[in-house]
């Protein structure tokens, strides 16, 4: 027995040396076993290399083993497999259950145990304790000695959890760490490795338990050779040295040999001369030797094999990597399998790599294990319990249904979802028969379908979901043990054909050549079964409720990750830096070389902080290295990664991340620039239009096609193009498969994002020959004809959600104010009679009655909405008080509320005769009409209630965006003209319903507060420019009015702050509005549905438009232009109105 070290820096051929020796031993005819011991993650690669090197080994003496497979071999021979193996899933489940049982004793950790990922951290620290042979008793003893209270409590609780874990495990189970302890014990009785020769390769260091196994192997084996990535042995080195960790490993192995009287053979030194890997690459040899040299050594020659790339963002970084891979394979005779792409943080890149490499046709394998929690099958199972635990919430139900593993098709799910969302269905409502009207909540979405049939359909779908689930929940609640609960869940999944559905999906994925997804799905069912098996194993006979079962099930799934085996021989390997080993790479791409990422500058501390570890070390409790040591070890990781290629090295870094946030280059970049002053540096931050750059953009057919189209677009703008792209165009044109695609794309160059005029006959059928139009619809058409067409022609509607939206708020407020006016009439009161107390009382009564009248009123559906109801009551009470104050201070009195004009209404509709002789009717409802009688003359003002800020602007009237108030006014005046009644306009106003916040620098009286409220809620609109009328409208006016937008000077004339119009100007506005209505109606009926939204400053019709995804309006599209509305002075608008009315003459009938 003896030990031999094989020294060699990166690339010196240590693995090759081991394989060559194994081959020689086989050829010499030696009969003893020849074992290559490597880390678990490298066994596949090592077996491949062994097969390639050995070629013939009929007696199968040469084997590749990891510590795990070594343990299995020994246990098979001498026993040790009788105890049930518990994997990381079972460990996590046991730990969670233990923490539930110990919750009364866990002040520090119990609450944290509910957090996702915390159980994994506890499992990791217990694993660390086991690896470093720290027992629960030692933890408790140390805790008693420690002065720091926080750490003392931590250790006490960890000791309790760890102790209970060990107690449960030793009854009949064994985990991976205990397997190493058992292996060390059983090796003594094993005969199969007696006289064997071991080559241990690929390790940087070992855990204490692995050292114990190695101690036993050293006693058994004829010889143990250990490769060490380092310089030739030195007596001592600093902890900042590149090879410090490897040196520590050497020292520990020497100590074991010394203590056990094991001979030390002459080491093999492979560090002489140029490393084997870099024999033909002077630059890489220099890099390997001087990467971390201090002071810097400079390579003064041209650098051709090492390059840097600065990318504008992560997408372009990966795309450039793909192009360079294509070039290497095409021009440098490399195979895809010669190429490795690596990143320190692969999770940041793997989706992009998958997308872009697939687009470029690059076969690749991503060596990354993925969490399974978002796999549809796992979601189907976890949401099964979530539905019950969250009382049939919308989110949990439809998370379950949308997995694709129910019997519902997408149309049924969508149909059901619309109904559930519109009616706020959750909880116990899923057990009832649904009778909520489709028409009421979904705005007549089912005009062509009988209401009864729709309800029958939605209830059938609902029952198909709820009945089997409720049966499952009932069966589950009757389960007496975890074993029975697992059986019920398993049977439920089998009854729903989940295993068969998975098989069908796998087959479909393979047929579509989606092998990676097929591979993932092929593992999922086994994982589900294994999780249930582990639950039965570790707590099978225990009683458990559904809540705890669900949590433990989630913990079990969290412990699993899905990995893949490379399905092809010739493909690019994409791996993370910390999983890299020599892959005989000829080309290496290091991506994401940014500051703090490569090398990593920080690590999560875990359960025990660095400070905790330092304190424990002082109490002789040795654990794994702290985060500071890990930072020092990063340079070794960087070294091994950068020196793993023999021919070509490209290091790239983006200057911005996925979200556009700036990133700094890694310190490695500046180090490379200093070592290699002649290094080639590329960048796409500024695109260069050179022949070389254009040629570089030619790679695979798909991406090159996109580059060609991009060049053609630039040609259209710059009026020049590189002739290369004309040659590329000819290549595609001569290929049948590409010709049609080219034609389609080139057609798109002339694309105009506009719509054709719809023939009048079709538009009439679409609008169903409607002749009645509301004012709001006309304003909608004026704002954007296309949005109007989509809403009223195509009947497209936003999905109705059970919520209290602004339109609902407006309707509610209008209804309350209307009911208040009815209550006043019933009690024979006038608005002048109201005081603040009565306003509060009457509004409370009205709101209560409205809520009682509708059993399912949304304002009673939750505490949040009940609070909103109280707030609205306060706002409306304030509005009623302000209205009463307005009326008290005015000679104008309300003559009507909710005054309708239309067929069979108080006032007839406004009739407009179009150019073709057709007639349309304008209909509507006026919130309030106030009247002032002056002799035989009557003056009216129109009041429209608004729940938000609304300001009347003349330019909006001119362009048709604000027609409402003037049409309301015209409906009254036109009717009066026909009846020869002398009624004159006094004003048109918006009244804002609000309870404003009043800010004051000092204490103010109630009277001052009321004035401030009135000022904030002043009417907005146009008042008749008649001083007498203004004074009648605000009898208390003194200067600027508190209630109307007007002011009176001291001499009795109208002030400048007055927002008004003369009698002639009101007439002008009426004529203009009628002309505008006629124009809009004719455009509408003539089929104009152009995409022309208005724009006024920063405000556009598109801002809150729900149809932007339909029109795809973009100003860079030909034909897409705004209808600009310029803010102008009043005088300019009046002149424009005058010219427009004079031009049209007697246009309005």
Curated annotation (Swiss-Prot):
Amino acids binding ATP: 8-15
Coiled-coil annotated spans: none
Highest taxon listed in the record's lineage: Bacteria
Bilayer-spanning residue ranges: none
InterPro entries for this protein: ADDB_N, DNA_helicase_suAddB, P-loop_NTPase, PDDEXK-like_dom_sf, PDDEXK_AddAB-type
Bound cofactor: record note: Binds 1 [4Fe-4S] cluster.
Protein keywords: 4Fe-4S, ATP-binding, DNA damage, DNA repair, DNA-binding, Exonuclease, Helicase, Hydrolase, Iron, Iron-sulfur, Metal-binding, Nuclease, Nucleotide-binding
One Gene Ontology term from the biological process aspect of the record: double-strand break repair via homologous recombination
Keyword DNA-binding recorded: yes
SUPFAM superfamilies: P-loop containing nucleoside triphosphate hydrolases
Enzyme Commission numbers on file: 3.1.-.-
Residues reported in the UniProt entry to bind [4Fe-4S] cluster: 784, 1102, 1105, 1111
Cofactor dependency: Mg(2+); [4Fe-4S] cluster
Remarks, miscellaneous: Despite having conserved helicase domains, this subunit does not have helicase activity.
Subunit structure: Heterodimer of AddA and AddB.
Family to which this protein belongs: Belongs to the helicase family. AddB/RexB type 1 subfamily.
Cited function: The heterodimer acts as both an ATP-dependent DNA helicase and an ATP-dependent, dual-direction single-stranded exonuclease. Recognizes the chi site generating a DNA molecule suitable for the initiation of homologous recombination. The AddB subunit has 5' -> 3' nuclease activity but not helicase activity.
Protein name according to UniProt: ATP-dependent helicase/deoxyribonuclease subunit B
Gene assigned in the entry: addB
